[in-house]
Amino acid sequence: MNNIWWQSKGQGNVHLVLLHGWGLNAEVWRCIDEELSSHFTLHLVDLPGFGRSRGFGALSLADMAEVVLRQAPDKAIWLGWSLGGLVASQIALTHPERVQALVTVASSPCFSARDEWPGIKPDVLAGFQQQLSDDFQRTVERFLALQTMGTETARQDARALKKTVLALPMPEVDVLNGGLEILKMVDLRQPLQNVSMPFLRLYGYLDGLVPRKVVPMLDKLWPHSESYIFAKAAHAPFISHPAEFCRMLVVLKQRV
């Protein structure tokens, strides 16, 4: 059984595991890892098939969560960005005793638009899947450009994301496709009503992938959770607003 790439740093008395989004890798956290490792024992992870975690094909969400858990500390705050938010949520559902708090960043329990549920139109996700087989580097770059659109620092934020992608070999097409399949099909809205650990949801007001309309809907569906919207951020608030982002996690640490 393959292991995934995993790096731990810092000496904090609380463990914090960071899970990246689709098409990316753990290098995306370099803008905040120094600050966070001064407060936490920080764990940077390349999800199976992404970055340095080679030798995996496309996995289901449940399998991806199990692979990640194998190398994880007994107890930690789990933070997942975008697709990583689904992985962290899945772990909170299946192994709640291992999760001190759940943090989702620019993530939705159901990324795909459904009846009376705002999200990414299924044909857009299907289009990305189709384009992957034609020109997958360009498709990934288009997806990244969507993530920073509208912010004051959109250009440099997009450059930071692109640099992260290009720093390591591109994931295999079937892995990227499998990730899009998860974004297209998974719906955790009902299951997450039952989690009891502290649950913090962070959003960008300008996010083009996770519409802000979902925030009040989830506030109502999950009254035990807390939400916060970064007013001038899009899909990557930790890149556009690193200091504010880290502050929120340090405050959360006091509660676990």
From Swiss-Prot:
Binding positions for substrate per the UniProt entry: W22, S82, L83, F143, L144, A145, L146, Q147, H235
Catalytic activity entry: 6-carboxyhexanoyl-[ACP] methyl ester + H2O = 6-carboxyhexanoyl-[ACP] + methanol + H(+)
GO terms under biological process: biotin biosynthetic process
Pathway: Cofactor biosynthesis; biotin biosynthesis
Any one GO CC term of the record: cytoplasm
Gene3D superfamilies: alpha/beta hydrolase
Location relative to the cell: Cytoplasm
Domain of life according to the entry: Bacteria
Name under which the protein is recorded: Pimeloyl-[acyl-carrier protein] methyl ester esterase
Family assignment from sequence similarity: Belongs to the AB hydrolase superfamily. Carboxylesterase BioH family.
Pfam families hit by this protein: Abhydrolase_1 (PF00561)
UniProt-listed Enzyme Commission number(s): 3.1.1.85
Record keywords: Biotin biosynthesis, Cytoplasm, Hydrolase, Serine esterase
Active site residues according to the UniProt entry: S82, D207, H235
UniProt-listed InterPro entries: AB_hydrolase_1 (IPR000073), AB_hydrolase_fold (IPR029058), BioH (IPR010076), Carboxylesterase_BioH (IPR050228)
Gene: bioH
Known partners and oligomeric status: Monomer.
Job description of the protein: The physiological role of BioH is to remove the methyl group introduced by BioC when the pimeloyl moiety is complete. It allows to synthesize pimeloyl-ACP via the fatty acid synthetic pathway through the hydrolysis of the ester bonds of pimeloyl-ACP esters.
DNA-binding as UniProt keyword: no
